[in-house]
Amino acid sequence: MTNIGSLLVDAATLMVTGMAVVFIFLTILVYLVRLLSKLVPEEVPEPIAAPKTNTRVQSTSSAVSPQVVAAISAAIHQHRASIAK
């Protein structure tokens, strides 16, 4: 049977080797991405024209009638009064 010390040395060697390989791979990947970002021009989107705003005021026929406003106000007042009790 193999000595526990040699097993630990083998495990540490394997761990350090794996970590070194991953570190080198990630370092190369970072530099390749930086290189590609400098080589490939950035796509600049065309400016979107702002939609024209309608400056016309809506006609008063589509506005809420004063009777509806009064009814809504009365309903809100009644609701708040019933909650306060």
Swiss-Prot record:
Question: Known EC number(s)?
Answer: 7.2.4.2
Q: Which cofactor does it need?
A: Na(+)
Membrane-traversing stretches: 11-33
Q: Which GO terms describe its molecular function?
A: decarboxylation-driven active transmembrane transporter activity; oxaloacetate decarboxylase activity; sodium ion transmembrane transporter activity
Q: Entry's InterPro entries?
A: Na_pump_deCOase, OadG
User: Does Transmembrane helix appear among the keywords?
Assistant: yes
Instruction: List the GO terms this entry assigns under cellular component, sorted alphabetically.
Output: plasma membrane
Record NCBIfam families: oadG_fam, PRK03814.1
Q: What name has this protein been given in UniProt?
A: Probable oxaloacetate decarboxylase gamma chain
Give the species. Vibrio parahaemolyticus serotype O3:K6 (strain RIMD 2210633)
